[in-house]
């Protein structure tokens, strides 16, 4: 970890010769108004910064001053890039928030948010730090404002069910019940008809920044072909399945739901 974590930071900061620039950290500088470059990576790139921050927080149990300084710098950068309402996704901030919350089948917005929350919870639990937690809670509160079963909210979910286990971790760390309620909604809403991914608004220009294009009708790929209580086999992309089935198990555990537990 003493070598890997600093190396990965340099890679994410486009400092390693011979590696294609990712823009991971640079996108936050652009979003904060500190760089005039254009977005040049993938829409999922924010999550790499958050994953690095979680790894760095865990490594800081063993006191590495170089990593601590880099973590502090990253946390400050996130704070500067975050919108006043809590929203924090560099692709959409850089593009003037056009099509925000569109194309969740591919845009990775809630996926990235989930990894921010997980990094914040780890930093709080391991280091007692609240600075990243404040950023994550502000974003989670805004997501709660935008998504849910209530009138006027988006009845949808991300193709990667990463926000769900992250919200359960945030609930268990803070005791704030609305985070569990929102995670419960996401878990139960996935797979209900009409299929969200078939009806959600498309993004007009995100295509060139995607990892790949998904088949429009392949709902099994994202475990969204049926509601979780009607699913009886593990299907789809293994990474997405891991997130979703973990979230479903969390929901069953935290709500003492034996029927869901048996199904999972």
Residue spans of the language-model regions?
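Glycan-recognition and catalytic cores of secretory/periplasmic carbohydrate-active enzymes
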Residues: 1-264
